[in-house]
Amino acid sequence: MFLSALFIIYFLFNTIKPQINHFKAHFNYVEGLDIGSDVKLAGIPIGKVTNLEINNGLIAVTGLINNEFAIPKDSIASIRSDGLFGKKSLLINPGFDNFFDSSNKNITFIETIDSYSIDMFLRYLKNINE
């Protein structure tokens, strides 16, 4: 009886647990994006950034996303802030192409848009005035 109950609990836990896909995107500039930052699809949180590393002169951003959400293959990954000075998140702007195969556990975004900060903008304005 005890083993049956244990098996049922184990089965329920493993079937309820969301399935996860890994993603990778490359950027030139990721200021403010951190490990643990949200990954959003059209503004809805669907995952987290798990690693940032420099790879061949670019910053490779990797993370986990819930595969319950269908992501078109031509989606664009960008880095955005919540408000003017808010924390950064990776935003997936959905495209219109076929969806990534949900059985494929690795998604690579071909097109990305870099993050630009207020600090960069102020430096740009300072250079114009000089």
Task: State where each predicted segment sits.
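Short beta-strand/strand-turn micro-motif
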Residues: 28-60
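Extracytoplasmic/periplasmic terminal helices and flexible tails
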Residues: 1-28, 34, 60-62, 66-68, ...
